[in-house]
Amino acid sequence: MSYILHLGHQPTDIAGISGLLNTTAGGFDPTLDVNAIRHVGFNSYSAPFSFSVPEPVGDLWLGFRYVPPNADANSINRAEASFLEFYSATNVLLAQIKPITTTNRYHAIAAGDTSAQGSSSYTAPNGQPQWIDVRVAVGAEITIEFYVEGVLQSTATAANANGKGKPRHVVFANTALHGISANRTWYYAHIAALDGVSTIGRRFVRRSPNAIASFNQMVGSIDALRDGDIATRVASTAAGQRMSFSLTGPTGPASVSAIAGVHLKQIAQAGTVGPDATTGFLRIGGVNHDAAPETVPDLAPKPVYSSWAVNPADASPWSDLTLPNEVGILSA
């Protein structure tokens, strides 16, 4: 089972970002992806976006790259300002990262039986790219920790005797993040949510389908997989059908200390007839290495993640020399 709860910042599985993808240099890391989510607005600007995750077994970790507003990010003058919010399955607020007008800093807030606000050392620097990591733990207590570039900036803990559930909805509140009535520009990119695994220092390279490879057994064109449009799809009429493809896109930083895993993400939905499960596979040296299948609903599409912590061909650690050049999807 994959520890991946969510990967990416594309509109296929994030609500509220249609039309906001942008390729301006500096908004994203070009070794990891090809675009970012860009916002432009006054200090009253509010444009939340969000995604949901399966219930985590462990703590929820959220990591992403943030470029604060290009001016006046260090001035917070509206009480409704909010950066991040975490909700339970029943939409009860669990925790929050909130810029506060009295300090101009981003504070961690745990919303348990009472609300607890932590002190903070973080003021957003104008237009300076940085990596944000947040840990949310829910049990007898609710704890939230807020990190910037791996350094803890704010934390808060509150009792949870009323038994609020684990985080299921992540909301980028994205409200009133600078302090002037003039347009400012800011960016989000490379979003990852992990189950019980720290996002600190982890970077995910997104590559996309390029061309059909060894298998083309499904109905539809590979264009439906590479266009980024959830409305265009391929279909399988029988269990065991495969479609495989080469990959295109960034290849990652020039130098990395280790590759922790390979993950294949698909967004799938069962039909009224035919197979109702899917999985991903890697093809290495002419051999298919299938992940465990996952049943998908027929009501609406859902993300399915297949993960390999090591090279399945020989159980060796991944390196940039052994990463697969061909991957695919398999109906089951």
What are these regions (language model features)?
Residues 156-187:
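Flexible glycan-contacting loops in extracellular carbohydrate-active proteins
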Residues 107-131:
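Short, aromatic/His-centered strand-loop micro-motif at the edge of beta-sheets
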Residues 68-75, 138-142, 266-277:
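Extended, low-complexity, turn-rich repeat/linker tracts enriched in Gly/Pro/Ser/Thr and Asp/Glu
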Residues 19-52, 226-240:
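Short carbohydrate-recognition loop motifs
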Residues 1-15, 176-332:
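Disulfide-rich extracellular domains of secreted proteins
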Residues 128-143:
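Localized edge beta-strand/strand-to-loop motifs within extracellular or lumenal beta-rich domains
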